[in-house]
UniProtKB/Swiss-Prot annotation:
Belongs to the amino acid/polyamine transporter 2 family. Amino acid/auxin permease (AAAP) (TC 2.A.18.1) subfamily. GO terms for biological process: amino acid transport; auxin-activated signaling pathway. The lineage of its organism: Eukaryota, Viridiplantae, Streptophyta, Embryophyta, Tracheophyta. This is Auxin transporter-like protein 2. Keywords: Amino-acid transport, Auxin signaling pathway, Cell membrane, Glycoprotein, Membrane, Symport, Transmembrane, Transmembrane helix, Transport. Induction: Transient induction in roots by S.meliloti. Residues 1-59, 101-135, 194-196, 254-266, 336-356, 400-425 are cytoplasmic. The chain crosses the membrane at residues 60-77, 80-100, 136-156, 173-193, 197-217, 233-253, 267-287, 315-335, 357-377, 379-399, 426-446. The keyword Mitochondrion does not apply. InterPro entries: AA_transpt_TM. Residues 78-79, 157-172, 218-232, 288-314, 378, 447-484 are extracellular. It is found in: Cell membrane. GO terms for cellular component: plasma membrane.
């Protein structure tokens, strides 16, 4: 990647004149230089491939380990069909977000607004296109979702490392990994995740195929049963976890803004989802085939596979990847916080890192309160992802282009596979109604019922969620028995 191309391209100027302004917080303007730089190669990303790696890596994090649990709640057929269904819906709404970003950016650039040293975020797109009420709605849902998305990564870290070293309980591991993940405050923006995104996707690819192959080699457990959906509450809990799986694009706008040519993002999320299918469907299917209903009480797939070097390797790689995903989820929160306290245009990485630290503290605390790995995914999916990722983008697109003049002057016309504005409206309306009723309604009821059951069973601040009880020590003989 040549440094002179590291400036973002202005969207307005016929989509072809390069704007050499960075538009990225905390970075100096690049000097035109044709020499190869290792720093640029590893640190400064903004290509289509960088965006693809970021989307795929962020989408397929710890959910790999909970999807077999969801299959045990849904049954094999429903599990596969819902993955495909929500994968398509998620790709469509990511496309809508990219269209709205381009529309917002093009309107602002026509007004000569300069985005140098400012990262555009989703709530700002909503504000610019639909007004302050939509800004508040987007800010509330997006920030809350990203907050709990970060919480889930911390919980997953503690859950996974426990299967390598159970000398410490999961709560203690949460303390340790909270401190480790706090180091993400030093990563300025999504430009700087190039090498991490690449490594992260490699790690999850290894883990997915480890789960698949290890389950097949293990074979079916003795007396395994596959009863499938037995209760509505379990069915909708599992369905909502899959909705959550393919709703990882709360950071879409930030990833787009980190691209040199953001208008090329349109189909990147779909391409990422197609790759993710090759990881999630085989692994979840194989683990469920091997262990069946036993997964209902084991939300982490690692817990049922035999301990060996291959499993330990997968655990370690997932831990590193969860650190990366924590950074993905937290970085937009860092940006929001910087804007609130007036530090967003600060050049010093150290000053910005110091300013960002307060964001990590509530995440750490919530991970200790709600350590329910698995059930918390479904709750977040139903209550937050349903709005953040599916309902709000679909409704926002419908309202942005409700007038004929807006459709006529749209920066992005309807896609080639759906060239009619009417068809787009119908599909968007279907998504809003479906996700509102099935995802938020039934999914919210089921996931919260299950979540409350976990609280009743294990309590808040559970020291070691779903850990095996310690072996009962044999009772010592009574003192008089020792004197025969």
């Amino acid at each position: 990647m040549l440094p002179q191309k590291q400036g973002e391209e202005a969207i307005v100027s016929s989509f072809n004149e390069t704007d050499q302004q960075e538009g990225v917080v905390g970075r100096e303007e690049e000097v035109e230089d044709h020499s190869f730089s290792v720093k640029n190669f590893l640190w400064h990303g903004g290509s289509v491939w960088d965006a693809w790696f970021s989307c795929a890596s962020n989408q397929v994090a710890q959910v790999l380990l909970t999807l077999p649990y969801s299959f045990s709640q849904l049954g094999m057929l429903s599990g596969i069909l819902l993955q495909v269904f929500y994968g398509i819906l998620g790709s469509w709404t990511a496309y809508l977000i990219s269209v709205l970003y381009v529309e917002y950016r093009s309107r602002k650039e026509k007004e000569n607004v300069n985005f140098k040293n400012h990262v555009i975020q989703w709530f700002e797109v909503l504000d610019g296109l639909l007004g302050p009420y939509w800004k508040a709605l987007g800010l509330a849902f997006n920030c809350t979702f990203l907050l709990f998305g970060s919480v889930i990564q911390l919980i997953a870290c503690a859950s996974n490392i426990y299967y390598i070293n159970d000398n410490l309980d999961k709560r203690t591991w949460t303390y340790i990994f909270g401190a480790c993940c706090a180091t993400t405050v030093f990563i300025p923006s999504f430009h700087n995740y190039r090498i991490w995104s690449f490594l992260g996707l490699g790690m999850t690819t290894y883990t997915a195929w480890y789960l698949t192959i290890a389950s097949i080699v293990h074979g079916q457990a003795e007396n395994v049963t596959h009863t499938g959906p037995k209760k509505l509450v379990l069915y909708f809990t599992g369905a909502t976890n899959i909705l959550y799986t393919f709703g990882g694009h709360a950071v879409t706008v930030e990833i787009m803004h980190a691209m040199w040519k953001p208008q090329k993002f349109k189909y990147i999320y779909l391409m990422a989802t197609l790759y993710v299918f090759t990881l999630t469907i085989p692994s979840a299917t194989a683990v469920y085939w091997a262990f069946g209903d036993e997964l209902l009480n084991h939300s982490n797939a690692f817990s049922l596979l035999p301990k060996n070097g291959w499993r330990d390797g997968a655990v370690i790689l997932m831990l590193i990847h969860q650190f990366i995903t924590f950074g993905f989820a937290c970085t937009p929160l860092y940006f929001v916080w910087e804007k609130v306290i007036g530090m967003h245009d600060t050049r010093s990485i150290c000053l910005r890192a110091l300013a960002r630290l307060p964001v990590v503290i509530p995440i750490w605390f919530l991970a200790i309160i709600f350590p329910f790995f698995g059930p918390i995914n479904s709750a977040v999916g139903a209550l937050l992802v349903s709005f953040t990722v599916y309902i709000i983008p679909s409704a926002a697109h419908m309202l942005t282009y409700r007038k004929a003049s807006a459709r006529k002057n749209a920066a992005e016309k309807p896609p080639f596979f759906m060239p009619s504005w009417t068809a787009m409206y119908i599909f968007n309306a279907f998504i809003v109604i479906w996700v509102l009723v099935v995802g938020f309604g039934f999914g919210g009821w089921a996931s919260m019922t299950n979540f409350i059951r976990q609280i009743d069973t294990f309590g808040l601040f559970a020291k070691c969620y779903q850990c095996k009880p310690p072996p009962v020590m044999a009772a010592a003989p009574p003192p008089h028995a020792l004197h025969h």
